[in-house]
UniProtKB/Swiss-Prot annotation:
Heterodimer of LeuC and LeuD. NCBIfam families: leuD (TIGR00171), PRK01641.1 (NF002458). It is an enzyme of class 4 (lyase). One of its GO terms (biological process) is L-leucine biosynthetic process. This is 3-isopropylmalate dehydratase small subunit. One of its GO terms (cellular component) is 3-isopropylmalate dehydratase complex. It holds the Pfam family Aconitase_C. The gene is leuD. Belongs to the LeuD family. LeuD type 1 subfamily.
Length: 202
């Protein structure tokens, strides 16, 4: 997982409220188990409109998506986060998120930023013509016009995103501690160790 430090670029001024995961990635795309190519299915129904914002050359490869309240509601599907990543989105800014979507986004290295509606409205305005910047360390969203919006983030999530640590990475980072614990267990509970060794050898 790539570390998240600063994200800067044009932001897609989407702004729609109550966008569920079926809008983000339709169910027919869930048959795949690979993450590559899912960007083509992202917001597929909305892309039927030839004037849709997602196919606009102006916002091609934009790393930030500005959304409305309750983004990512509906059924749980990690493919929604995969699809956004495949589009090039590294952060989503919205007034609120579905808890499940927020968790899936975090596990896949997407930063979810919660800001009040007034800030969203201002960013939507700026995004029409100018870039937006997110600084994870400072926990701020800024614009070229001296706008500065602060956001809160769970310290654990911040640490993981800043260091590019997913669940596997976190486990590997504590490899020495795990090995030490296993050695102690073998000494203090040898009868359990025998069972573990038998399973490992099978």
């Amino acid at each position: 997982m790539e570390p998240v430090k600063q994200i800067e670029g044009r932001a897609i001024p989407f702004g729609r409220k109550n966008v569920d995961t079926d809008v983000i990635i339709p169910a027919r795309w869930l048959k795949t188990i690979t993450r590559q190519g899912l960007g083509r299915g992202a917001f597929e129904a909305l892309r039927a409109d030839p004037d849709n914002i997602f196919d606009s050359a102006e916002f091609a490869g934009s790393p930030i998506l500005i959304a409305g309240d309750n983004f990512g509601c509906g059924s749980s599907r990690e493919h929604a986060a995969w699809a956004l990543l495949d589009m090039g989105v590294k952060a989503v800014i919205a007034p609120s998120f579905s808890d499940i979507f927020s968790g899936n986004a975090f596990k896949n290295g997407i930063l979810t930023v919660v800001l009040p509606q007034e800030a969203i409205d201002r960013l939507m305005e700026v995004a029409q013509t100018d870039p937006v910047s997110i600084d994870l360390e400072a926990q701020t969203v800024t614009t070229p016009f001296q706008d500065r919006f602060s956001f809160e983030i769970d310290p654990f999530r911040k640490h993981c995103l800043a260091n590019g640590l997913d669940e596997v990475g976190l486990t590997m980072a504590r490899g020495d501690a795990i090995a030490t614990h296993e050695a102690r267990m073998r000494e203090s509970l040898p009868f359990l160790a025998k069972g573990t060794d038998a399973v490992a050898a099978a």
